[in-house]
Amino acid sequence: MIEISHVDKWYGPNFQALKDCTTSVAKGEVVVVCGPSGSGKSTLIKCVNALEPIQGGDIILDGIKVNDPRTNLPKLRARVGMVFQHFELFPHLRIIENLCLAQEKVLGRSHDEAVAKGSKLLDRVGLTDHAQKYPAELSGGQQQRVAIARALAMDPIAMLFDEPTSALDPEMISEVLDVMVDLAREGMTMMVVTHEMGFASKVAHRVIFMDQGEIVEDALRADFFGKPRSDRAQKFLSKILSH
């Protein structure tokens, strides 16, 4: 589904954000990417759907080479859901309108079809009663659940999450993670950048640990939490799990 091969990413001539990164995400697999701040994990996930260009290597998404200049990136991005740290909802649109816009403009669905799909997804994330509200009327956790529903409305082949809970108050985190756990258990292909090790230990098939732009460890969940191979991963886990 997602193939990342020897990827390099530079910001200017002096800072290399990603260094020879190679990994993959199979169909139906949940892969968590973790690591300290500045390790390159958010950069990596943004490169998957070309929100950030790469300077070396290849990224293949469902058989399509992302970094090929001939690739229709808007069309490709429409097939991959992306949920950001900050919810990126349109503040001037009601919640149901946020869910309908891309369905109508990108997928060509009728307004009635889009509303039906959006309403079904709002029910799925527990927000049916908020369809006619504006984003500012919702809590951060509710807005993030709307963002997930909006991504799902496009019937994505995979979902990318870039620290989806890091901007939330602690009491709101679980409501977002619960939706993500349900998605994982339904077989959605997911690549998730997060510090939520409870989520990773519950649903991740594999865990990738990054540091200083490198993939230091790429292991099965049980191996990563049971006996990480690298000193850097061991120190990271001991620090995270001690809080």
Q: What does each model-found stretch correspond to?
A:
Residues M1-R221:
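ABC family nucleotide-binding domain
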Residues V216, A222-H243:
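C-terminal boundary and immediately downstream tail of ABC-type ATPase nucleotide-binding domains
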